[in-house]
Swiss-Prot record:
Annotated coiled-coil segments of the chain: none
Domain notes: The IMP cyclohydrolase activity resides in the N-terminal region.
Entry annotated with the keyword Transferase: yes
PANTHER family: BIFUNCTIONAL PURINE BIOSYNTHESIS PROTEIN ATIC, BIFUNCTIONAL PURINE BIOSYNTHESIS PROTEIN PURH
Protein name (record): Bifunctional purine biosynthesis protein PurH
Alphabetized Pfam families for the sequence: AICARFT_IMPCHas (PF01808), MGS (PF02142)
CDD domains associated with the record: IMPCH
Cysteines engaged in disulfide bonds, as pairs: none
Domain of life: Bacteria
Enzyme Commission (EC) number: 2.1.2.3, 3.5.4.10
Family indicated by similarity: Belongs to the PurH family.
Annotated gene: purH
Domain spans labelled MGS-like: 1-144
Record pathway: Purine metabolism; IMP biosynthesis via de novo pathway; 5-formamido-1-(5-phospho-D-ribosyl)imidazole-4-carboxamide from 5-amino-1-(5-phospho-D-ribosyl)imidazole-4-carboxamide (10-formyl THF route): step 1/1; Purine metabolism; IMP biosynthesis via de novo pathway; IMP from 5-formamido-1-(5-phospho-D-ribosyl)imidazole-4-carboxamide: step 1/1
Length: 501
C-alpha cells in the first residue's frame, strides 16, 4: 500500500531534507499553502491538499486541512476492517506521516502586537491534525518538533519502519506541546479577567537539563516561560560554565533586590539570602559597601549590580571567589578582568524582573499568590520623635531589603547599607539579635512583620538604633511605641507585612 505524508509547517527548517528523504522512498507528499509553494519551489514532488479534498482554501487560509477526507485518512485504524472498508467505499487514502509545526503564538504573544493580530496566530488546523495523528500513533508517525526529523529518518534507514516506542514518544510530545500551547492561549485570553482561574494552566519550555538540583542526588531542569520575557529567561552568559540550579535561584533573588532601587545598587547574596546590600554613586562604591557589610558570607556568593560594571569594579570583584556576577552590561575592559577568573559566571541580565504570580509546589498541589511588590500603604510616624530625612531614606531602603529575607526577618541599615541581616528565625527577638550582632553601628532597623512584644525595641536601643520601621498591627503595638518613646527612638508603621516562607 502506498504511503503518504502530510506536511504543513510554519518553521521550514529541516523540512526539505525530510521531504526528499520520504520521496526517495516513494512516499507521496501532500501539503498546503506556504509549505506547498516552498516544497514546489525546491523541486520536491508534492500534491496540494485541495487535490485531495476537491475543496479550495478559504477564509484567508483559515480553512485548509479541516476536512473529513484529511482526518479520516489520519484517524482510520489500519487493522479495523470496518474503518478500512469505509475508506475504500469513500475513496479516501490513508495518511501515514503527519509533519506539522504551529503558528508561532508563543513568540507573537510577547511582541508589541494588537489583540487582534495576536489572535490571528492562534493555530487551529495544525493542532487538529497533530492531535488526530497522535491519537492514532500506532498507524501514523507524527512529527511536531524538527529535532525529531533525524530520529525518524535514522529508524527508517535501519529498520525500514518507525518503532512503536518512538511513535508513542512522538505522540506524547504532541500532547505535551498542545497543553503548553493551549495554556498560553488561555492565559492570553483570560489576562486581566480572572486572576485565579478554575484550572491552572502554565506554559513553560525546557531550556536545559541541569547537572543536578540543590544537591547532587537530585535531578533538575530549567524551564522558561513561553508567555513573557522575565529576567531569568533572557539573560546571557558572558563567561564561565552553565548556571546550576542553585545559581539560578540565587541570581533571581539577587537581581530582584538590586532592581528594587532606582539609584545604583548592589546585592551580595548567599543561599537565597542577601548578605550585603548597598546603594551609592557608582558600581565600585556599592560593591565595596556590600562587601564590607559582610566580607565573610559574600565568599562564594552571587553579586548583582543594577548598573553597567566598569573595570575598577571588576578589579575589586576578582580579589575574592564569587560564583556569579550579574549586571545589565559590562565595559569591555571589565569583561577582560572578569574573564581572568575562568569559572566565574558573568551574566548580562537584559530584563528587569516582571511582577507575575508566584507559585510553589506542595505535596499534591500548587499554591499561587501575587508577587510581594507593595512596599507600604503609608509611612505613619507613631512615636513622639520623628525620623530625620536620612533615617527615613534608610527605613525605606530597609523595607525593600527585608522583604527578600526569610521570616522572621530584621535588617539593620546605616547610610544606604544593610549592615546587618537576620533571617529565618522562629521568633523575632532572635532575628533582631542576629541582625544587631552583625550590623553593629547601624542606625535604622526594619522588620518584615510587627513586634509581638517590646523586647525587640529594648534590644535595638541597647545597640544604638535610632529609628525603626515595621508594619504594625500587633495587639501590643502600644507597648512597642511606649518603649520607643522611653528610648528616644522614632518608629514608623507601614501597614504592609512582608512575610517570606
Amino acid at each position: 500500500m502506498k504511503k503518504r505524508a502530510l506536511i504543513s509547517v510554519f518553521d521550514k527548517d529541516g523540512v526539505l531534507e525530510l521531504a526528499k528523504f520520504l520521496r526517495d522512498r516513494d512516499v507521496e507528499i501532500i501539503s498546503s499553502g506556504g509549505t506547498y509553494k516552498y516544497l514546489k519551489e525546491n523541486n520536491i514532488e508534492v500534491k496540494e491538499i485541495s487535490e485531495i479534498t476537491d475543496f479550495p482554501e478559504m477564509l484567508d487560509g483559515r480553512v485548509k486541512t479541516l476536512h473529513p477526507l484529511v482526518h479520516a485518512g489520519i484517524l482510520a485504524i489500519r487493522d479495523n476492517k470496518e474503518h478500512m472498508k469505509t475508506l475504500e467505499e469513500r475513496e479516501i487514502n490513508t495518511i501515514d506521516y503527519v509533519v506539522v509545526n504551529l503558528y508561532p503564538f508563543f513568540e507573537k504573544v510577547r511582541e508589541n502586537l494588537s489583540f487582534e493580530e495576536k489572535v490571528e496566530f492562534i493555530d487551529i488546523g495544525g493542532p487538529t491534525m497533530l492531535r488526530a495523528a497522535a491519537k492514532n500513533f500506532k498507524d501514523v508517525v507524527v512529527l511536531s518538533d524538527k529535532k525529531d526529523y533525524e530520529k525518524v529518518m535514522n529508524e527508517i534507514k535501519e529498520n525500514n519502519c518507525v518503532s512503536f516506542k518512538l511513535r508513542k514518544t512522538l505522540a506524547g510530545k504532541v500532547f505535551n506541546l498542545m497543553s503548553a500551547y493551549d495554556a498560553a492561549i488561555s492565559n492570553f485570553l483570560l489576562e486581566g479577567e480572572e486572576e485565579y482561574p478554575e484550572y491552572l494552566s502554565v506554559s513553560y519550555k525546557k531550556i536545559q537539563d541541569l547537572r543536578y538540583g540543590e544537591n547532587p542526588h537530585q535531578g533538575a531542569a530549567y524551564y522558561s516561560s513561553t508567555e513573557f520575557d522575565g529576567a531569568m529567561n533572557s539573560f546571557e552568559i558572558l563567561n564561565g560554565k552553565a548556571l546550576s540550579y542553585n545559581n539560578i535561584k540565587d541570581l533571581d533573588i539577587a537581581w530582584k533586590v538590586a532592581c528594587e532601587f532606582e539609584e545604583t545598587a548592589c546585592c551580595a547574596l548567599k543561599h537565597n539570602t542577601p548578605c550585603g546590600v548597598a546603594v551609592g554613586e557608582n558600581s565600585k562604591e556599592v560593591y565595596l559597601k556590600a562587601y564590607d557589610a559582610d566580607p565573610v558570607s559574600i565568599f562564594g556568593g552571587i553579586v548583582a549590580i543594577n548598573r553597567k560594571i566598569d573595570k575598577a569594579t571588576a578589579e575589586e570583584m576578582v580579589k575574592i571567589f564569587l560564583e556569579v556576577v550579574a549586571a545589565p552590561d559590562f565595559d569591555e575592559d571589565a569583561l577582560e578582568v572578569l574573564r581572568t577568573k575562568k569559572n566565574l559566571r558573568v551574566i548580562k541580565c537584559k530584563n528587569t524582573p516582571q511582577a507575575k504570580n508566584y507559585m510553589v509546589t506542595v505535596d499534591g498541589g500548587i499554591l499561587v499568590q501575587g508577587e510581594d511588590n507593595k512596599l507600604a500603604n503609608e509611612y505613619k510616624v507613631v512615636t513622639e520623635k520623628e525620623p530625620t530625612e536620612m533615617e527615613l531614606r534608610d527605613m525605606i531602603f530597609g523595607m525593600k531589603v527585608v522583604k527578600y529575607v526569610k521570616s522572621n526577618a530584621i535588617v539593620v541599615v546605616k547610610d544606604g547599607v544593610a549592615t546587618g541581616i537576620g533571617g529565618g528565625q522562629v521568633n523575632r527577638i532572635w532575628a533582631t539579635k542576629e541582625a544587631l550582632e552583625r550590623g553593629k553601628g547601624g542606625a535604622v532597623l526594619a522588620s518584615d512583620a510587627f513586634f509581638p512584644f517590646r523586647d525587640c525595641v529594648d534590644e535595638a536601643a541597647k545597640n544604638g538604633i535610632k529609628a525603626i520601621i515595621q508594619p504594625g498591627g500587633s495587639i501590643r503595638d502600644e507597648e512597642s511605641i511606649e518603649a520607643c518613646n522611653e528610648h528616644g527612638i522614632s518608629m514608623v508603621f507601614t501597614g504592609v507585612r512582608h512575610f517570606k516562607h
